[in-house]
Amino acid sequence: MLDNSAQEFLDFLKKVSPTAAITFRGYIDRTPTKPRPIGAPTLVATSHSVAIATNNLEKPEVAIFIGSNGRDLTPFLKGAPAYNLQEVTYLPGTYFYQYPPMEFLGVTIQVHEELHLNEETRKYEPTRILNGWDPIILELEPQLRATYANPLDLPEGASERFLIPLD
């Protein structure tokens, strides 16, 4: 059972319009050797910013989330830049297709595709189809270079929610 403030926050998130985005976390799961579906029992916090999501690449690993139903909190925190972590949050019960980790520009990356249940086929399918790697690379590569060249001055603990496992 959720306490009142947690339930109020969840109710708020459900009212926020879903957004299609490529976002990031700073934790990857090194155990999969082949793609697999995973379910998120809790909220999944991701960020538009590689630097924020990884605490300036504290560990050289980036989880990439491709989805259509995350709730973008960035506009709500526009007036509070010190607290705006460019967060896109997925609701509890969201499913992802998790791919094995791979190397890219000296960083270990892991792709997660958000899934939805197709009512006709009763199979899970990606919510957003990308035509190849280009959209991911166009989002990721400049951010990796910028994070290495000019790390952000982040408050202590700002990235913590992006650095923990999904379970």
For each feature predicted by the language model, list its residue ranges.
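Mono-ADP-ribosyltransferase
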Residues: 1-167
